């Protein structure tokens, strides 16, 4: 029985991710929020809460983006209730997904470690 519940939570996560992505884009346009996208959604097993991870295109405005979505959470949840066929839509909790920022920092560090090809040729002779 628990396996069925997990599969349902996963299906609902995917559906919320898809539907909320469109709603977030509309909120960006309508409310002047920084440009962002939904990167992941995790729904609890009891379907009461959903962690929504968002990525802002401008990392320096990430706090503003998440704060704007938190202010609109109730409205977004009501809009989801109209599009989804659920008796109860999970409460939305927005979090900034910094994985892209961390990945970019790692790429920068790796690029700095690799010596330029011209410098290697000069050293070899």
From Swiss-Prot:
The keyword Kinase does not apply. One of its GO terms (biological process) is maturation of SSU-rRNA. It is found in: Cytoplasm. One of its GO terms (cellular component) is cytosol. One of its GO terms (molecular function) is ribosomal small subunit binding. InterPro entries: KH_dom-like_a/b, RbfA, RbfA_dom_sf, Ribosome-bd_factorA_CS. Keywords: Cytoplasm, Ribosome biogenesis. PANTHER family: RIBOSOME-BINDING FACTOR A, CHLOROPLASTIC-RELATED. One of several proteins that assist in the late maturation steps of the functional core of the 30S ribosomal subunit. Associates with free 30S ribosomal subunits (but not with 30S subunits that are part of 70S ribosomes or polysomes). Required for efficient processing of 16S rRNA. May interact with the 5'-terminal helix region of 16S rRNA. HAMAP family: RbfA. Monomer. Binds 30S ribosomal subunits, but not 50S ribosomal subunits or 70S ribosomes. Belongs to the RbfA family. This is Ribosome-binding factor A. The lineage of its organism: Bacteria, Pseudomonadati, Pseudomonadota, Gammaproteobacteria, Lysobacterales.
